């Protein structure tokens, strides 16, 4: 019975560890010319947690593997990206027609 209890607790703890937020970083560029985009909003979908890209188009934030990042910038199509197991996320935004 104790073995079963320890097995259950071990599985439950591993799920909790997997769901924890991890630092994610990346870069957002323009699909038109490959230049970094400054000031792109990067938000975790369904939350108010987010950040903006810097002068190099780089961003950093904490997110879980199940989180979806929403990238938005004036004049560009909004893009959603599932974090998954990626710690580095490269995103290209396309201009609106």
Give the ranges of each region predicted by the language model:
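Sec-dependent N-terminal signal peptides
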Residues: 4-13
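Periplasm-facing N-terminal accessory domains of Gram-negative outer-membrane beta-barrel systems
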Residues: 7, 18-97
